[in-house]
Amino acid sequence: MPDTKIVLIAGPTASGKSALALKMARETGGEIVNADSMQIYGGLPVLTAAPSPEELAQAPHHLFGAVDAADAWSVGKWLAAATAVLDDIAARDRTAIVVGGTGLYFRALTHGLADIPPVSETQREVSALLYAAQGEPEFRDVLAALDPEAEARIEIGDRQRLLRAHAVAIATGKSLTAWQTDTKPTLADGTWTGLVLDPPRAQLYDRCDARLGLMVERGALDEVRAMEARGLEPALPALKALGYRELAAHLRGETSLDQALDAARQETRRYAKRQMTWFRNQTPDWERVETLAPYGSLRDRLPPEGEEP
C-alpha cells in the first residue's frame, strides 16, 4: 500500500466518533472509511447510526451501506475492501479517516489478518466440551502448554478467546500466537495515527439511552419492519444490529415498545462496556479522547511524514 496519512478513530457506540470523523474530513479535505461491522450493511441506516444524507453530502464516505443484509461479511472481506479504498485514497493524495467501533477491523489494519486454516466445527465442539469438563483454571493449564503467550494475554473469563486459541493450536499444529506473529500489518508503520474516544461511562450510557428513542422517532421501526418482511435468516450478522431483536419482538406483538426500548438500552450499555474494555486492552498506545472540545483544529492530529504513531 502506498504511504499516506491515515487516521484511525475508534470507540464505543454513541461516543461521537462519526462527528469527530466528519469534522476532521471537512478540515482536511479527507475521506471517511467505515470500520463498523453493522454500518457496512444497507437497509438499517437509522438503527445502525450510519451517516445521514446530509452528513454524506459533506465529505466522501466509503463502505457505508455497501453490502446487502442477506450477505455475511467477515473481517477478511472488510479488510480486502478497505485496503482497496485506502489505496485509491492514497493515489489521490487525500487523507483517509477510518472510523468505527469494530475492534477486529482496526486490529486487522494495524496487525494484519493471520491466514489461519479453517477450524472444523467438530474441533470447536471438542474444545468447548473440554472447557466445560475441566473448568477455566485447568483449561488454562492445557492452553499454556500449547500457546503460553495466548494463555497469558487472554483475560480471566474470556471463554471465547480461550476456546479459539485452543482449537487453532490443536487443529493446525501451530499456536494462534505463532500464526499472528508471522502476519505482517496491513498499514505500514509511520503512515497512521490512532485515536480512541473514551468518554466517562455515565455520559456514554446517557447518550446510548437517548439515542435509541431518537432512532425510533426517525424511522427505526419502519426499517426493522421492512427487514423482517424479507424473511432473512435470523442468524445473519446484519440482523444482530443493536436494538434489532428487541424492536422485531415488539413488531410481532411480544412486547410493548417501552419494554423493547428498555431491553435494547440494557443491551446497548453492555455492548458499549465491552467495546470500552476491548479498546483499553488492545489499543493501549492510542491517544485517548474524552471529549471533542479540546480538539480545535484537527489538522494537527495528522502524523508528520515519517513519524510513527
From Swiss-Prot:
The record marks 102, 124 as: Interaction with substrate tRNA. It is an enzyme of class 2 (transferase). Its cofactor is Mg(2+). GO terms for molecular function: ATP binding; tRNA dimethylallyltransferase activity. The keyword Magnesium applies. ATP binds at residues 11-18. InterPro entries: Dimethylallyltransferase, IPT, P-loop_NTPase. One of its GO terms (biological process) is tRNA modification. Its EC number is 2.5.1.75. Keywords: ATP-binding, Magnesium, Nucleotide-binding, Transferase, tRNA processing. It catalyses: adenosine(37) in tRNA + dimethylallyl diphosphate = N(6)-dimethylallyladenosine(37) in tRNA + diphosphate. It comes from the Bacteria. Signal peptide: none annotated. Substrate binds at residues 13-18. Transmembrane segments: none annotated. Residues 36-39, 160-164 are annotated as: Interaction with substrate tRNA. Catalyzes the transfer of a dimethylallyl group onto the adenine at position 37 in tRNAs that read codons beginning with uridine, leading to the formation of N6-(dimethylallyl)adenosine (i(6)A). Belongs to the IPP transferase family. Monomer. This is tRNA dimethylallyltransferase. The lineage of its organism: Bacteria, Pseudomonadati, Pseudomonadota, Alphaproteobacteria, Caulobacterales.
